[in-house]
């Protein structure tokens, strides 16, 4: 049985969408697999994404934005989700 921690999907009125998914997974760093994405559904443009889906040149934990990909600190999935939500709120307010 899969231990899902978060499985959230929200579409905003401006046609942007936020998806947050995380589950316990022993094969991933911190024993958690996650992907958090905020994007424009009309254009497909990624506005913000956090994930640990692969080991990139910037480390296991990374942040994708319009300016590229960068490593990001990871303490725990709860705080990581809150940080993502805060960034989404800021980006959404400026759209």
Located regions from the model:
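Short helix/strand-capping connector loops at secondary-structure junctions
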Residues: 58-72
């Amino acid at each position: 049985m899969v231990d899902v921690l978060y499985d959230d999907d929200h579409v905003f009125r401006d046609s942007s969408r936020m998806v947050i998914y995380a589950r316990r997974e022993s094969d991933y760093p911190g024993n958690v697999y996650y992907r958090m994405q905020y994007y424009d559904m009309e254009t497909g443009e990624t506005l913000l994404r956090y994930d640990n889906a692969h080991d990139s040149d910037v480390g296991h934990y990374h942040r994708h934005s319009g300016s590229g990909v960068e490593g990001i600190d990871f303490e725990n999935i709860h705080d990581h989700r809150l940080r993502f939500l805060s960034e989404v709120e800021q980006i959404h307010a400026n759209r």
